[in-house]
Amino acid sequence: VVSPLARGQPHFEARELHGTQWGRICPFETPEGANIGLVKNLALLVNVSVGVDDKQVEELLYELGVAPMVTKKVRGKVLKGYLDDIIEKLDRGELTGEEYRGWSRVFLNGKLIGYHPDGEQLVKTLRTLRRRGKLGPWASELNVAHIKQGPINEVIVNTDAGRIRRPLIVVENGVPKLTKEHVEKLKKGELTFEDLVKMGVIEYLDPDEEENAYIALTPDQVGPEHTHLELWIPGIFGITASIIPYAEHNQSPRNMYEAAMAKQALGLNAANFQRRVDTRGHLLHYPQKPLVVTRAIEVIGYNERPAGQNFVVAVLTSTGYNIEDAVVLNKSSVDRGLARSTFFRLYTTTEYKYPGGIQDEITRPPPSVRGYRGQRAYELLEDDGIVAPETPVQGGDVLVGKISPPRFISAQEYAVGGVTRQDTSIAVRHGEKGVVDMVLITMDDEGNKLIKVRVRDLRIPELGDKFASRHGQKGVVGLLVPQYDMPFTEEGITPDLIINPHAFPSRMTVGQLLESIAGKAAALRGESLDATPFYKESIENLKLVLKRHGYLPTGEEPMYDGRAGELLKGLVFIGLVYYQKLHHMVSDKMHARARGPVQILTRQPTQGRSRAGGLRWGEMEVDCLVGHGASLLLRETMRERSDLTRIYVCEECGFIGYYDKNKGKLICPIHKDKAVLKPVDVSYAFKLLIQELMSMGIKPRLIVEDILKR
């Protein structure tokens, strides 16, 4: 649900979570930053109306006693119009003003269609017909409400498309219509959810009709005044927020962060991943079902497509390499396959045909073509100009050799009549590596030859890779420690991951602590454990499970230092937590350069890994060097290694001179060839600034006396 409001404005009212969004909009799933609160997501149980033809609904309303605005013929009957009747009585002098007092205005999809003497009774009749299935196949699409407040007396009937509606259990005379018999038939498959809607046991309400409803949260709250009962309270969450166990024990922003990070987790996105040719994709090698689950996980099919693994997690400061949200990973667990994944990248090219009978050619480019990359780049190509599957490749290696007609023909080529073709081969991106996984040769819609090459890269967790639990506790790997140096319990269990205890107090993610205890209890019990928000298994039961198996009910255990073999002072909180590997990996982001391309305008190094760019020295980094007095390093960094250029300055006027090729000498724009020009080494960006100032009529002068004295 995307708001059209401008992202640059505060719009506090639009961004805030409103009470009317209960059950329709997920309270957690919204992005951080400028879009917060403006991009919303639907809750788990909502239904968006598809709409029905309002003509038959309008005719039904007239049959139920609605007086049309003007006289009209409906199904063979002539109905006198509300306005026509008033005009006639006015003409006869019989209008007293009491005839239509208390009548309700009737709106159909926002359009005033007439008046009814008893709006409340009309609404009751429509609801009764809908619940009894007497309105036909479009009955469930109709919503009706009676708004009577002060001078307002309106009946609102909605049948249009795009309304967010949510299911509720109908309550009649203080008794919910959904019974245990219905539930048993649902479990056996004798009834479907749609059947319950047709039977009037469950009905979808839109925001207008919900204004007339008094909804009980739980069955024990139902009283004679209630009209509906909540179907399932966790249904207020969206799909991604529904996978958070013990969500009601977390601070709200943490659930919001997890709702965003769940979409970044690696897993098994499709069963046919070996045949698919996505532009890019990740695949977790050993995804596991979470031990601590919510009921929504089964509903959305998360167990069939999991996106994480169950880690043994200890809460410990350990070596200090896990400060500031870093985590320490067990290197031996990683060697055994923990959080191992594969990255797929697709490279595509097409052999196009052009007017005039010329076309591209897939082949190994000869050295004579324009833009030839050197023999080393084409070493991996076979005779057909395409790389073979299972070939190791790295940045710059050509995967598909292709030569094309040039975009522009020089005058010399045109005169001779020979056109030099140019190299348009597809090569592996700068800084990437991998193995050719699949080569697909086919044709596009226009009959051109189409080649797709998929490259895979094995991703083993390394320093800087990002991990997150299901409670918004994200962190990067700070250290990989061999198993023999990791702390271990009395049973010899070593944790897969060590998280810093300082990650918990200020963030108040109590849900992760509960999940750790529940995960341990689930492993001991041998079955997954329900942690659905508001309907979870009792924490006291979990403590009993731990106690029964000889563990402390608090989830703590004595642990030994793996390096010294000494017992650690104090007990360590250790358990099982479901962790997600996120697609932010250091191998996708790390880059450096010694030399490379520069920008055309400023002649400074390009920025960004994909452009073989350098790392920017910002203001704060420069200030550090200034503070250290590292003047030579400053000069090298800001000038020699960036955009050093030599200009010639007139010692009389301080203007930048230029070289006259015809005269073979340096010329000052003011003193012409009589001036003495001195060489000055500056940054090209500085020279550009001076020339831009000159273009605006400003006269900057460079004083070079100090250079002359030296």
Residue ranges and their predicted role:
Residues 1-710:
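Conduit-forming functional cores of very large proteins
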